[in-house]
A protein has these predicted regions:
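Short coil/turn connectors at secondary-structure junctions
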Residues: 8-12, 32-35, 50-53, 75-79, ...
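Active-site loops and adjacent core secondary-structure elements that bind or stabilize anionic groups
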Residues: 155-163, 168-277
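N-terminal glycine-/serine-/threonine-rich phosphate-binding loop
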Residues: 4-60
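Glycine-rich nucleotide/cofactor/substrate-binding loop typically near the N-terminus or early
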Residues: 42-113, 205
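A short, charged helix-loop
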Residues: 105-128, 132-174, 230-236
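Gly-rich Lys/Arg/Thr-decorated short loops/hinges at beta-loop-alpha junctions or inter-strand turns
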Residues: 5-11, 72-79, 113-122, 141-142, ...
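General beta-strand structural signal in soluble alpha/beta enzymes
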Residues: 15, 36-41, 55-59, 84, ...
Length: 277
C-alpha cells in the first residue's frame, strides 16, 4: 500500500461534545498544529474561551440550530465534509462544486441517556436525551475511517492525545480503524440502552453492549479464562483476598440474592453457592 494514502493529515476538526472536561489539552495541541475548528453552541464557546478561533456550523450550513437544538449538524455540508472519499474523483468534484470543506477529525460525545434514566427523570426529559446528530456524526465518520478520525467519547481522549503527541496532527490507517471500532462500540451500546428502556417490563429481548471491564483470575476451572462485563467496582468493594474468579462471582450473586430476602442486617458465608455459616 502507498504510505501517503494511509497516513492522513488532520486539517479540519468538527467538535461537538456534551462533556468538555479533559478536552482543552487536545484542542490546544491541534491548534498549535494549525488545525481549523468547526463547532456548535456551547462547544464553540468553550473552544473560543481557550483563545482558539472556531467557525460555527451555522455559518457553514447557512442554517441556525432549530427545534430547540434538535437539529444542529444534520446538513449535507457537514456530512458531505465527513463522508467524501478523498481518492474518489467524483466525490471531490462534488464537494468543490457545493463548497463543502473536508472534515478530517470528528470529536463527539453523546447526550447522557442512561444517566438521565437512572436519575428518575420523567419520560419527556429522557426522550430529549436521545442523541440524533451526535450518533449520526459517529456513524458517518466511522464509516469513512479510511479518511477520518472519529473520537466518540471522552474515554477515547487519552488515546487521541497519545496519537497526536507521537505523530502531530496526522493519523495512520491503523489508528483510524481502531477509533472507528471504538466508535461503533459506543453507538451500539447507546442504542442498546435506548431499546432496553423502551422494552421495559415487556422483556421481549435483552440487548447488552459493554466494554471488557474485568479479567477474572480464571473461569469455572483453573485452565479456563473468565471475563466479567459490567461495573464491578461500582457495586462492590473487595476488602481482602485474591483477584476475583468466575466461581467467586457466582458466590457473590448467591449472597446478594440471599441477604435480599431479609430486612435486617444479615451476614452469610457461602461456598459453591450454598450458605454454610
Amino acid at each position: 500500500r502507498c504510505f501517503m494514502l494511509e497516513n492522513k493529515k488532520i486539517k479540519t476538526a468538527l467538535v461537538s461534545v456534551f462533556h468538555k472536561d479533559g478536552l482543552d489539552e487536545i484542542l490546544k495541541l491541534l491548534h498549535a498544529e494549525g488545525v481549523n475548528f468547526i463547532s456548535t453552541g456551547g462547544t464553540q464557546s468553550f473552544i473560543e474561551s481557550l483563545g482558539i478561533p472556531c467557525g460555527s456550523v451555522e455559518n457553514l450550513t447557512g442554517y441556525p440550530s432549530i427545534l430547540g437544538g434538535r437539529v444542529k449538524t444534520l446538513h449535507p455540508k457537514v456530512f458531505g465534509g465527513i463522508l467524501n472519499r478523498r481518492e474518489n474523483e467524483v466525490d471531490q468534484q462534488q464537494i468543490t462544486q457545493y463548497e463543502i470543506p473536508s472534515i478530517d477529525l470528528v470529536i463527539v460525545d453523546l447526550y447522557p441517556f442512561e444517566e438521565t434514566v437512572a436519575s428518575g427523570a420523567d419520560e419527556s426529559a429522557i426522550i430529549e436525551k436521545i442523541d440524533i446528530g451526535g450518533i449520526s456524526l459517529i456513524r458517518a465518520a466511522a464509516k469513512n475511517y479510511k479518511d477520518v478520525v472519529i473520537v466518540a467519547s471522552k474515554a477515547q481522549y487519552a488515546p487521541l492525545l497519545a496519537m497526536l503527541k507521537e505523530k502531530g496532527a496526522s493519523s495512520s490507517l491503523e489508528d483510524r480503524r481502531w477509533f472507528a471500532k471504538e466508535a461503533f462500540a459506543v453507538s451500539s451500546g447507546y442504542d442498546s440502552a435506548i431499546f432496553n428502556y423502551f422494552d421495559g417490563d415487556e422483556a421481549s429481548a435483552f440487548r447488552y453492549a459493554g466494554n471488557h471491564a474485568k479479567t477474572l483470575r480464571y473461569g469455572e476451572n483453573p485452565h479456563q479464562k473468565g471475563v466479567f462485563y459490567g461495573n464491578f467496582e461500582e457495586m462492590f468493594d473487595q476488602l481482602h483476598g485474591k483477584e476475583i474468579s468466575y466461581n467467586n462471582l457466582l458466590d457473590i450473586d448467591a449472597a446478594v440474592s440471599l441477604i435480599s430476602e431479609f430486612d435486617d442486617t444479615t451476614f452469610a458465608i457461602l461456598k459453591h453457592n450454598n450458605a454454610c455459616g
